[in-house]
């Protein structure tokens, strides 16, 4: 299996690649995990992973038209895709961090700052471990997990106005926070699977064996 971690000058590329290798080993999957922005690699990949940290606008600019087109072509042809943190956010219609920036438009909704005014105790960024709520068996990504397992979050912006049908798991932080989304062969996690220890490795392993 060829797994490509998209190189778009974003953060966490090496740690995401290493986590994917470890998850593959745990699942007994032979996986060649590479970090690349090369069209041949991306268009011939068996799995695509888009990590991300930083601002939505900066990450979107890092993709540029060429990588956007490659990702659109590959995923339209059925290649499973996993976005992590800002990589997940880029799947939506647009983001409002540092001005309005268009996303990939694969899922409904937009990325806005979480509302500190709604809860006096809310502090941003939302950083640290938080519990995941989901319906067991509803999606392969959560196989082997139980509601109440924890993911590691670091973000101040989150998905708003999304479609309930895209939601796989949520967390609570002053309000409901979309934690895992999926539509067809495209999925994403708001939390950092590469930092989420056994839970993250389980999700990555499920992604590697996932057929949408």
Curated annotation (Swiss-Prot):
Q: State where it is primarily located.
A: cytoplasm
Q: Which Pfam families match?
A: GATase (PF00117)
Record keywords: Amino-acid biosynthesis, Cytoplasm, Glutamine amidotransferase, Histidine biosynthesis, Hydrolase, Lyase
Pathway connected to this protein: Amino-acid biosynthesis; L-histidine biosynthesis; L-histidine from 5-phospho-alpha-D-ribose 1-diphosphate: step 5/9
Swiss-Prot/TrEMBL catalytic activity: 5-[(5-phospho-1-deoxy-D-ribulos-1-ylimino)methylamino]-1-(5-phospho-beta-D-ribosyl)imidazole-4-carboxamide + L-glutamine = D-erythro-1-(imidazol-4-yl)glycerol 3-phosphate + 5-amino-1-(5-phospho-beta-D-ribosyl)imidazole-4-carboxamide + L-glutamate + H(+); L-glutamine + H2O = L-glutamate + NH4(+)
- The lineage's top-level taxon is Bacteria
Name the Gene Ontology biological process terms: L-histidine biosynthetic process
Show where the Glutamine amidotransferase type-1 domain sits.
2-212
Q: Give yes or no: UniProt keyword Hydrolase.
A: yes
What subcellular compartments does it reside in?
Answer: Cytoplasm
PROSITE patterns per UniProt = GATASE_TYPE_1
* Catalytic residues in the record: 85 (nucleophile), 192, 194
- Output one GO MF annotation: imidazoleglycerol-phosphate synthase activity
Supply one GO CC term from the record: cytoplasm
The question of whether Hydrolase is a record keyword is answered with yes
Per the UniProt entry, the disulfide pairs are none
According to its UniProt record, the EC number is 4.3.2.10, 3.5.1.2
User: Its biological function?
Assistant: IGPS catalyzes the conversion of PRFAR and glutamine to IGP, AICAR and glutamate. The HisH subunit catalyzes the hydrolysis of glutamine to glutamate and ammonia as part of the synthesis of IGP and AICAR. The resulting ammonia molecule is channeled to the active site of HisF.
Q: How does it assemble?
A: Heterodimer of HisH and HisF.
Q: What is this protein's name?
A: Imidazole glycerol phosphate synthase subunit HisH
Instruction: Give the lineage.
Output: Bacteria, Pseudomonadati, Pseudomonadota, Alphaproteobacteria, Acetobacterales
């Amino acid at each position: 299996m060829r797994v490509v971690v998209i190189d778009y000058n974003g953060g966490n590329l090496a740690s995401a690649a290493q986590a994917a290798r470890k998850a593959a080993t745990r699942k007994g999957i032979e996986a060649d995990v590479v970090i690349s922005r090369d069209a041949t690699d991306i268009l011939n990949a068996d799995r695509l992973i888009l990590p991300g940290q930083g601002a939505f606008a900066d990450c979107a600019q890092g993709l540029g038209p060429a990588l956007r087109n490659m990702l659109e072509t590959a995923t339209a042809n059925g290649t499973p895709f996993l976005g992590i943190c800002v990589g997940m956010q880029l799947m939506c219609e647009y983001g409002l961090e540092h001005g309005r920036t268009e996303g990939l438009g694969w899922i409904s909704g937009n990325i806005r700052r979480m509302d500190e005014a709604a809860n006096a105790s809310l502090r941003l960024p939302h950083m640290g471990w938080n519990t995941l709520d989901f319906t067991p068996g509803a999606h392969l990504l959560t196989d082997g997990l139980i509601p109440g397992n924890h993911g590691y979050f670091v973000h101040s912006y989150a998905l708003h106005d999304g479609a309930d049908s895209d939601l796989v798991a949520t967390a609570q932080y002053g309000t409901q926070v979309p934690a895992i989304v999926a539509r067809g062969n495209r999925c994403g996690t708001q939390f950092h699977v590469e930092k989420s220890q056994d839970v993250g490795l389980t999700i990555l392993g499920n992604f590697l064996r996932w057929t949408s």
